[in-house]
């Protein structure tokens, strides 16, 4: 099966490696596609939206029409994992904790709000053990991390840190505040591949 990684900007290589490792653990044959143009979405069974800079990713995608096609695919049920800035791409609402500024939604396909820089800027990056529903203990790497605020009962909180949602799921969409690709633990990527089957 083909699994894509949005490859406009951000942590692409790390996600490609983790998808391949997760596939090995699950005994699945996976071809990883770097998604840069609308046609790269053809025949994908799942996609990862990596961390990086959500606005930059969106603007680059808009130039080729990738944004519209990706939004359609997600609304049609393409399983997706959005990590950090990737979660912001998916969110219906976005605001910055430091400035209070609200931003226009980018893809806006999931019923949660992303509060950017919730735990502070780059120097406030940290790691913490999380209890993830269906997975158990998972080491979360937080870098300029947001939190997610569910805006509908359709959004299930899978993990929290200090009472704030840091991993959520709505239908075909999984979003994390942290970076699972920066660990050696493939279980969140395995969750995505299981959704794609």
UniProtKB/Swiss-Prot annotation:
It catalyses: aldehydo-D-ribose 5-phosphate + D-glyceraldehyde 3-phosphate + L-glutamine = pyridoxal 5'-phosphate + L-glutamate + phosphate + 3 H2O + H(+); L-glutamine + H2O = L-glutamate + NH4(+). L-glutamine binds at residues 52-54, 116, 143-144. One of its GO terms (cellular component) is cytosol. The keyword Hydrolase applies. Its EC number is 4.3.3.6, 3.5.1.2. HAMAP family: PdxT. Catalyzes the hydrolysis of glutamine to glutamate and ammonia as part of the biosynthesis of pyridoxal 5'-phosphate. The resulting ammonia molecule is channeled to the active site of PdxS. NCBIfam families: PLP_synth_Pdx2 (TIGR03800). PANTHER family: PYRIDOXAL 5'-PHOSPHATE SYNTHASE SUBUNIT SNO, PYRIDOXAL 5'-PHOSPHATE SYNTHASE SUBUNIT SNO1-RELATED. In the presence of PdxS, forms a dodecamer of heterodimers. Only shows activity in the heterodimer. This is Pyridoxal 5'-phosphate synthase subunit PdxT. It comes from Ignicoccus hospitalis (strain KIN4/I / DSM 18386 / JCM 14125). The gene is pdxT.
């Amino acid at each position: 099966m083909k699994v894509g990684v949005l490859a406009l900007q951000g942590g692409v290589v790390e996600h490609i490696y983790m998808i391949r490792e997760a596939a090995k653990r699950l005994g699945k044959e996976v071809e990883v596609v770097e998604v840069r143009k609308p046609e790269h979405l053809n025949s994908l069974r799942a996609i990862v939206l990596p961390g990086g800079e959500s606005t930059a990713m969106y603007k680059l995608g808009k130039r080729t029409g990738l944004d519209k096609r990706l939004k359609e695919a997600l609304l049609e049920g393409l399983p997706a994992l959005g990590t950090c800035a990737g979660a912001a791409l998916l969110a219906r609402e976005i605001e910055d904790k430091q400035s209070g500024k609200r931003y226009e939604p980018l893809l806006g396909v999931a019923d949660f709000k992303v509060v950017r820089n919730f735990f502070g800027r780059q120097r406030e990056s940290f790691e913490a053990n999380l209890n993830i529903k269906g997975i158990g203990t998972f080491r979360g790497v937080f870098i300029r991390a947001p939190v997610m605020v569910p805006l509908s009962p359709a959004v299930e909180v899978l993990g929290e840190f200090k009472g704030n949602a840091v991993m959520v799921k709505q239908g075909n969409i999984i979003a994390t505040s942290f970076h699972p690709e920066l660990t050696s633990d493939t279980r969140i990527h395995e969750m995505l591949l299981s959704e794609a089957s």
